[in-house]
Amino acid sequence: MAFLKKSLFLVLFLGLVSLSICEEEKRETEEEEYNQEDDDKSEEKRFLSLIPTAINAVSALAKHFG
């Protein structure tokens, strides 16, 4: 009977360890996806902030040559 209890305890322990590892990997994946979304948004903001500068430069060149 003691052997059965030890075996059951071992199976439950190993199951909990593997479940914990899976949850940790899932959290890391979710964090990476969230960080990637933030990076994409910041790149978009940087690009959008360059548009007025580019328009001003083009209009200045047009005035200079036109």
Swiss-Prot record:
Residues 1-22 form the signal peptide. InterPro entries: Frog_antimicrobial_propeptide, FSAP. This is Phylloseptin-Az3. One of its GO terms (biological process) is defense response to bacterium. Expressed by the skin glands. It is found in: Secreted. It comes from Pithecopus azureus (Orange-legged monkey tree frog). The keyword Iron does not apply. GO terms for cellular component: extracellular region.
